[in-house]
Amino acid sequence: MSKEVLSKSKEKMEKAEQALTRQLGTIRAGRANASLLDRLSVDYYGAATPVNQMASISVPEARMLLITPYDKTILGEIEKAILKSDLGLTPNNDGSVLRLSIPQLTEERRKELVKEVKKEAEEAKVAVRNIRREANEELKKLEKNGDITEDDLRSYGEDVQKLTDESIKNIDSITKDKEAEILEV
């Protein structure tokens, strides 16, 4: 039972790390990356549809995204969605594809992005700490019910703390890598 608590906690912590990685992937770091458009949705026949489900997104050059819609009639809608988004990019529509040139980031914008990265990382750390708290509460319930001894409680508590420390170390590493990518000129 207590091993289940540990494995569930580890799984949840890994999911928090993966969520952070996905979230940071959508932050523009000066290089073209198809995941920049992951959060972008377009109104398609009355339903909000992600751009990556209605178009092929490729990276022909280091600072360019090429969006080729499967249905050419939706090209204008995708263009409007990009202009309305907080990406700060201006699409170039040539009738069949959209080209997104990704400009160099200014020093000021880089600092804003680093702040955003740190905020996302802190949210991930809070999630991991909440998972630790939940695991410790479950272990205390098990001890109270007589399923594990007090010594087991302490031992499993230490294991949960090790998982937490490892997860936070991974989050710090992910964050550091993203910050380096953003600050790279």
Curated annotation (Swiss-Prot):
One of its GO terms (biological process) is translational termination. Keywords: Cytoplasm, Protein biosynthesis. It is found in: Cytoplasm. One of its GO terms (molecular function) is ribosomal large subunit binding. GO terms for cellular component: cytoplasm. It holds the Pfam family RRF. CDD domains: RRF. Belongs to the RRF family. Responsible for the release of ribosomes from messenger RNA at the termination of protein biosynthesis. May increase the efficiency of translation by recycling ribosomes from one round of translation to another. This is Ribosome-recycling factor. The lineage of its organism: Bacteria, Bacillati, Bacillota, Bacilli, Bacillales. The gene is frr.
